[in-house]
């Protein structure tokens, strides 16, 4: 039985403990957060425990819900909870920023802390990516770590008002509007363009925010992410949701 521990960014009462098994599915997004809501849509049998106190959340998951495996969301830096595996994600499009820590740069920790990783997953890999920089950096601190190269692959385009699945190429060669409240809106726009769509506008909102209904007044199809879709209670007819999955392209083993 798997439990996921999350801070629940963008939700009220972040300090209190909220468990997915104790609330209605319609409340997942409001009480747990958008990302946990997406996970529970895809894997409804998992237990999500939201709370700022990660140790307390872990105790609730194990003692009250019999969880045998715990996944700590966004927990690489949280050193107060022992773990068996440490999965490090690296964004291939900006792997190490300017080498500086927040707020002078993008890094949360110095590069030397790569040594704590037991697995490394490189995301948003493109065909023209020069992998040498990433391999050399990882190997210099964690020589025995396996590196997985991945990309977000579109799987389907859903019309949420009717629940009808559309072909991924239905808007190929047509003008569309992109809207999202994610950390990297440029990547979402590129994905739509790779599917042949002509993106005439991109409305980017702060991460974990709700897309303004003003966007839906467009005469063009509006494409959003699955993460954004869980926040929209009454989808309009021109709204479509692009769903993606993480695909492993290749694995680089030590040696």
What is the predicted role of each segment?
Residues 7-9, 74-77, 185, 224-231:
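Short, polar loop motifs at secondary-structure junctions
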Residues 49, 90, 150, 203, ...:
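Hydrophobic residues at beta-strand termini and immediately following loops
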Residues 95-221:
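C-terminal accessory "lid"/substrate-recognition subdomains
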Residues 153-157, 205-210, 237-255:
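Short, flexible loop segments at boundaries between secondary-structure elements
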Residues 20-22, 45-46, 84-87, 196-200, ...:
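Active-site regions of enzymes building and remodeling cell-envelope glycoconjugates
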Residues 56-60, 133, 187-191, 231-232:
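Phosphate- and divalent-cation-binding pockets in alpha/beta enzyme and binding domains
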Residues 9-11, 16-141:
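Phosphate/Mg2+-binding loops and adjacent switch elements
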Residues 1-5:
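A conserved segment at the C-terminal end of the G1
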């Amino acid at each position: 039985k798997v439990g996921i521990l999350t801070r629940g960014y963008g939700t009220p009462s972040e300090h209190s403990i909220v468990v997915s098994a104790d609330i209605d599915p319609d409340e997942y997004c409001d009480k747990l957060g958008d990302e946990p809501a997406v996970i529970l849509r895809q894997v409804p049998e998992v237990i999500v425990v939201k709370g700022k106190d990660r140790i307390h959340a872990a105790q609730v998951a194990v003692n009250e819900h019999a969880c045998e495996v715990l996944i700590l969301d966004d927990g690489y830096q949280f050193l107060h909870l022992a773990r068996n595996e440490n999965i490090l994600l690296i964004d291939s499009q900006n792997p190490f920023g300017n080498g500086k820590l927040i707020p002078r740069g993008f890094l949360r920790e110095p590069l030397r802390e790569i040594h704590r990783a037991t697995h490394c997953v490189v995301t948003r890999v493109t065909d023209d990516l020069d992998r040498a920089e990433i391999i050399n950096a990882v190997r210099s601190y964690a020589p025995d770590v396996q590196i997985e190269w991945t990309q977000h692959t579109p799987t389907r385009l859903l019309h949420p008002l009717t629940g009808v699945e559309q072909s991924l190429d239905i808007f190929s060669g047509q003008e569309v509007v992109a809207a999202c409240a994610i950390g990297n809106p440029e990547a979402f726009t590129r994905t739509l363009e790779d599917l042949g769509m002509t993106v005439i506008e991109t409305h980017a909102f702060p991460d974990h925010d709700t897309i303004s209904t003003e966007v839906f007044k467009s005469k063009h199809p509006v494409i959003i992410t699955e993460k954004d879709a869980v926040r929209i209670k009454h989808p309009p007819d021109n709204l479509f949701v692009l769903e993606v999955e993480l695909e492993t392209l290749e694995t680089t083993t030590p040696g």
